Amino acid sequence: MKLLIMCEGPNELKIINILLENQKLKFSSDDLLGLVPYHARQIKSSAAVKAALNLYPDEVHVLRIGDGQNEKLEIPSAYKDKITLVEKYCTKPELEMLLIISENLAAEYEKVKSKTKPKTFAKANIRCGRRRYDNSTAFYEEYFGPDCEKLV
Protein backbone atom coordinates (compact mmCIF):
# COMPACT_ATOMS: atom_id res chain seq x y z
CA MET A 1 0.00 0.00 0.00
CA LYS A 2 1.19 3.49 -0.88
CA LEU A 3 -0.09 6.95 0.02
CA LEU A 4 -1.05 9.41 -2.70
CA ILE A 5 -0.84 12.94 -1.31
CA MET A 6 -2.72 15.46 -3.43
CA CYS A 7 -2.25 19.10 -2.44
CA GLU A 8 -4.73 21.58 -3.90
CA GLY A 9 -2.27 24.49 -3.96
CA PRO A 10 1.47 25.06 -4.23
CA ASN A 11 1.67 26.44 -0.68
CA GLU A 12 0.09 23.30 0.79
CA LEU A 13 2.55 21.26 -1.26
CA LYS A 14 5.47 23.30 0.09
CA ILE A 15 4.34 22.78 3.71
CA ILE A 16 4.01 19.01 3.16
CA ASN A 17 7.45 18.86 1.53
CA ILE A 18 9.02 20.75 4.45
CA LEU A 19 7.40 18.35 6.92
CA LEU A 20 8.52 15.32 4.88
CA GLU A 21 12.10 16.57 4.52
CA ASN A 22 12.33 17.04 8.29
CA GLN A 23 10.67 13.71 9.20
CA LYS A 24 7.77 15.41 11.00
CA LEU A 25 5.03 13.16 9.60
CA LYS A 26 4.02 9.61 10.53
CA PHE A 27 5.21 8.46 7.12
CA SER A 28 8.20 9.12 4.88
CA SER A 29 8.60 9.73 1.17
CA ASP A 30 9.27 5.98 0.81
CA ASP A 31 5.59 5.45 1.71
CA LEU A 32 4.39 7.79 -1.04
CA LEU A 33 3.22 6.86 -4.49
CA GLY A 34 6.03 8.02 -6.77
CA LEU A 35 8.01 9.02 -3.63
CA VAL A 36 6.55 12.57 -3.73
CA PRO A 37 3.39 14.51 -2.90
CA TYR A 38 1.56 16.01 -5.89
CA HIS A 39 0.02 19.40 -6.66
CA ALA A 40 -3.32 18.19 -8.00
CA ARG A 41 -7.01 18.79 -7.31
CA GLN A 42 -8.33 15.87 -9.34
CA ILE A 43 -6.75 12.67 -10.63
CA LYS A 44 -8.12 13.10 -14.16
CA SER A 45 -6.41 16.48 -14.60
CA SER A 46 -2.94 15.39 -13.44
CA ALA A 47 -0.79 13.42 -15.86
CA ALA A 48 1.82 12.89 -13.12
CA VAL A 49 -0.73 11.36 -10.72
CA LYS A 50 -2.18 9.12 -13.44
CA ALA A 51 1.31 7.96 -14.47
CA ALA A 52 2.21 7.11 -10.86
CA LEU A 53 -1.07 5.22 -10.38
CA ASN A 54 -0.49 3.30 -13.62
CA LEU A 55 3.01 2.24 -12.53
CA TYR A 56 2.03 1.03 -9.05
CA PRO A 57 0.20 -2.33 -8.96
CA ASP A 58 -1.17 -2.38 -5.39
CA GLU A 59 -3.71 -0.44 -3.34
CA VAL A 60 -3.45 3.29 -2.73
CA HIS A 61 -4.79 5.54 0.02
CA VAL A 62 -5.37 9.15 -1.03
CA LEU A 63 -4.72 12.07 1.33
CA ARG A 64 -6.15 15.32 -0.07
CA ILE A 65 -4.97 18.59 1.44
CA GLY A 66 -6.55 21.94 0.68
CA ASP A 67 -9.18 24.51 1.54
CA GLY A 68 -12.02 23.13 -0.57
CA GLN A 69 -14.40 21.41 1.83
CA ASN A 70 -17.07 20.36 -0.64
CA GLU A 71 -15.21 19.32 -3.79
CA LYS A 72 -15.46 15.55 -4.10
CA LEU A 73 -12.56 13.56 -5.49
CA GLU A 74 -13.64 11.96 -8.73
CA ILE A 75 -11.95 8.59 -9.05
CA PRO A 76 -11.67 7.47 -12.68
CA SER A 77 -13.04 3.97 -13.25
CA ALA A 78 -9.56 2.64 -14.08
CA TYR A 79 -8.51 3.31 -10.47
CA LYS A 80 -11.69 2.47 -8.52
CA ASP A 81 -10.33 -0.89 -7.31
CA LYS A 82 -6.84 0.45 -6.64
CA ILE A 83 -7.86 3.46 -4.50
CA THR A 84 -9.29 1.98 -1.31
CA LEU A 85 -9.43 5.05 0.93
CA VAL A 86 -9.75 8.82 0.49
CA GLU A 87 -9.16 11.19 3.42
CA LYS A 88 -9.62 14.97 3.23
CA TYR A 89 -7.56 17.36 5.35
CA CYS A 90 -8.99 20.86 5.19
CA THR A 91 -6.86 23.96 5.67
CA LYS A 92 -9.81 26.21 6.55
CA PRO A 93 -9.98 28.97 7.55
CA GLU A 94 -6.75 29.54 5.59
CA LEU A 95 -3.17 28.31 5.51
CA GLU A 96 -2.09 31.73 6.83
CA MET A 97 -3.34 30.68 10.27
CA LEU A 98 -0.12 28.65 10.60
CA LEU A 99 1.85 31.89 10.28
CA ILE A 100 -0.44 33.78 12.66
CA ILE A 101 -0.13 31.06 15.31
CA SER A 102 3.63 30.77 14.79
CA GLU A 103 4.03 34.52 15.38
CA ASN A 104 1.90 34.34 18.56
CA LEU A 105 -0.64 36.66 16.95
CA ALA A 106 -3.69 34.42 17.39
CA ALA A 107 -5.14 36.59 20.17
CA GLU A 108 -4.66 39.72 18.04
CA TYR A 109 -6.31 38.03 15.08
CA GLU A 110 -9.27 36.91 17.23
CA LYS A 111 -10.07 40.59 17.87
CA VAL A 112 -10.47 41.33 14.14
CA LYS A 113 -11.43 37.99 12.59
CA SER A 114 -15.07 38.96 12.00
CA LYS A 115 -13.97 41.59 9.49
CA THR A 116 -10.47 40.49 8.42
CA LYS A 117 -9.44 37.32 6.58
CA PRO A 118 -6.31 35.51 7.79
CA LYS A 119 -4.57 36.30 4.48
CA THR A 120 -5.18 40.04 4.88
CA PHE A 121 -4.07 39.96 8.52
CA ALA A 122 -0.92 38.04 7.61
CA LYS A 123 -0.04 40.49 4.83
CA ALA A 124 -0.27 43.36 7.32
CA ASN A 125 1.47 41.68 10.27
CA ILE A 126 3.81 38.87 9.23
CA ARG A 127 7.42 39.29 8.15
CA CYS A 128 10.32 36.96 7.51
CA GLY A 129 13.42 39.06 7.97
CA ARG A 130 12.73 42.18 5.93
CA ARG A 131 10.23 40.47 3.67
CA ARG A 132 6.52 41.02 4.24
CA TYR A 133 4.15 38.06 3.76
CA ASP A 134 3.05 37.90 0.12
CA ASN A 135 1.21 34.55 -0.22
CA SER A 136 4.08 33.08 -2.25
CA THR A 137 5.47 29.58 -2.01
CA ALA A 138 8.92 31.15 -1.61
CA PHE A 139 7.74 32.95 1.54
CA TYR A 140 6.59 29.65 3.11
CA GLU A 141 9.96 28.11 2.22
CA GLU A 142 11.90 31.02 3.76
CA TYR A 143 9.69 31.17 6.85
CA PHE A 144 9.25 27.47 7.73
CA GLY A 145 12.14 25.83 5.85
CA PRO A 146 14.93 26.74 8.31
CA ASP A 147 12.72 26.10 11.36
CA CYS A 148 10.04 23.52 10.66
CA GLU A 149 9.37 23.23 14.41
CA LYS A 150 7.07 26.22 13.86
CA LEU A 151 4.77 23.81 12.02
CA VAL A 152 4.49 21.12 14.68
Please annotate each region the language model reported.
Residues K2, L13-G34, S46-V152:
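C-terminal accessory helical subdomains adjacent to catalytic cores in phosphodiester-
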